């Protein structure tokens, strides 16, 4: 088992790790994703475990379901069961977010995961994270967008 400095939320059983130094916006973005339907897996410290060829995220038992919200303190939220991680999002300042990201991966416990960089305080950060997680869970994060459109849409163009 590996414990990392990251928050983690899950949507439909698919988890995303939100990484960044203290104050980078991990809990802030996680809270906005929870407001949009995600569930908290872990806040600030995430345990990773390898199961077959899957990486599973969970919360240390002492903080399960607890989220530290700046200005409010610790708040209890609904906690997700351990969830399979499909994506890592590094939280960075706006100038460090590439307009067109190159494919990038990072390994945890010998399992490679796709990585993206996002500005967590951008108004659209939560929807970008949600869309990226959907694409990563389907194995299509770095495919060109037109490859993901239904054929009927491509024919109409």
Task: Report each predicted region and the residues it spans.
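Glycine-rich phosphate-binding P-loop
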Residues: 9-34
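Conserved nucleotide-sensing/catalytic segment adjacent to the nucleotide-binding pocket
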Residues: 35-93
């Amino acid at each position: 088992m590996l414990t990392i400095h990251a928050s983690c939320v899950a949507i439909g059983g698919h988890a995303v790790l939100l990484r960044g130094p203290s104050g980078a916006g991990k809990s802030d973005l996680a809270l906005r994703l929870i407001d949009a339907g995600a569930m908290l897996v872990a806040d600030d410290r995430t345990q990773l475990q390898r199961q077959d060829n899957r990486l599973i995220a969970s919360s240390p038992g002492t903080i399960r379901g607890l989220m530290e919200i700046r200005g409010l303190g610790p708040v209890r939220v609904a906690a997700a069961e351990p969830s399979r991680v499909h994506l890592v999002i590094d939280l960075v300042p706006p100038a460090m977010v590439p307009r067109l990201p190159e494919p990038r991966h990072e390994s945890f416990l010998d399992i490679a995961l796709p990585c993206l960089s996002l500005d967590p305080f951008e108004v659209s950060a939560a929807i970008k994270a949600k869309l990226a997680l959907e694409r990563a869970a389907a194995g299509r994060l770095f495919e060109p967008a037109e490859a993901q459109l239904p054929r009927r849409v491509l024919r109409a163009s």
